[in-house]
Amino acid sequence: MGWRGGWVLSLLVVGVGCGGALPEEQTEAGLAQEPTSAPEVTAEGLCLPTAAGTQRVKTILPPSEIGIPRFAMGPGGFVDFKGTLHFAVNYEDGRRGLWRSTGTDAGTTQVKGFPATGSGSLLSQLTATPTQLFFQAPDAAHGSELWVSDGTTAGTRLVKDVTPGPEDSYLTHLTAAGSTLVFFKETYDATVFTTRYELWKSDGTAAGTVRLRDFGTSVDVSYLDAKQGNALLFFVRELEGATSLWRTDGTAAGTVQVKRLDAGPDTYPNDVRTSGALTLFRLSESSGLTELWKTDGTAGGTLRLASFGPTRAVDVLGSLGAYAYVTTTSYSTQYMVIYRVPLAGGNPEPVVTLPNDYTSQGDALPFINAVSQAPGGTKLYFSVTIGSNGPAPRDTQLWVTNGTAGGTTLLRRPLSLSDEYGSPVYAVADNLVFFSAYDDATGIEPWVSNGTVAGTRLLKNIDAQASSYPHEFFRQGNRVYFSAYDDTLNAQLWSTQLSHACVAPEDAQ
């Protein structure tokens, strides 16, 4: 993957109400005072899945006419609705379908099909409330609009033609706020060359699908958001002014500005990561400063934790216990350092410096590509991409950390070295993570790890002739589903069985 434009960040890190400096660059390689070794695997009870337990669920899509596996659009948008997997299928010929699966061929069926419209709009944004499944889909009469399903064909219908006629509606931020759906309608206004942002809610009926607030055309609503409890958190930036955090619970009274974060102008949120009741994010300022923030969705619980100046790039990893974890990467030395920042306030502390074998070979800046933490987990799994002066990376690596130097381990390298396909990282438990990796013998295939080097291995060689390019790992009950390109010459629905009864490791087939 090519260089991702990041915000420049600094040597100086300041905790709330106090100051503290990062170590000088020449000391980076010696920050870790204890060896970086494999962490102890926690007793989560889940075992490494097997190749035998990894099977194609159903052949849904015909052979691809595009014929480029990494571009194949297989089943996706996985969501749990009433205890059953639901997902979208978008065919190359323009047809669309809402599907469901119980994990068997016979139990994998189409709920509702949509004929091709020629618009290119996808069936997408599946969002479940306790009793209704909302999604966006196109038809010839209404364009791409909001639909709802109760899980049956008869109970799947258009909610409302939000933009009357065949013109598409551009809907974003679909989020369940209890039994209510909240979302934004974005409309480009050609008269002022800006976008109008409107916050809407829906109860699944046309009459109950109404606008909550018109934010107008003088602001920009970030594509980043967070779900906390039954509320949606989102960021609003005045085009010539401040950036603020907002929340909505689907009511007019519950749609409020939580806090004004920065006076601006040109301040943008990045790396929004939620763990339990806490969300971390960073603000990037035009001055080159970057700030680490935390929020629990209240004004009092929305606080700046640290500031970083313009000589380093910063990525947010997440929170473990009493600390937030970030990485800082020096633009001059090209070393990445993990820091922990007290959530209660205080100076950041270095944890460990990650190795970089390419610092003397020109452009080789590391950055975080993906992060995953199991619900309630005590470890962070993350992928590091080491860039180059071209579109493809020099290296890609899977790491795990429990917040200590000794518990920070390189599990696998390389992952994907393509600039057109990045490896997903999906932690099911502290001792089970799914990802994809490259091997000379198999290409890019699904892999698993229990958080140790010895417990990191190929799950299954799905496409014996090439790479299967797995996408969208998703746990539903005792299975993990994903999309993979296989011998049907298209990406199909696959799953692997989770187990609490461990067996001796097998050779992946």
Name the predicted role of every residue range:
Residues G15-G17:
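C-terminal motif of bacterial Sec signal peptides marking the signal peptidase cleavage site
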Residues G19-A21:
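Bacterial signal peptide processing site
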Residues S37, A43-Q509:
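Feature 14080 marks short, conserved micro-sites in well-ordered regions
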Residues M1-V8:
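Bacterial N-terminal signal peptides that target proteins for export
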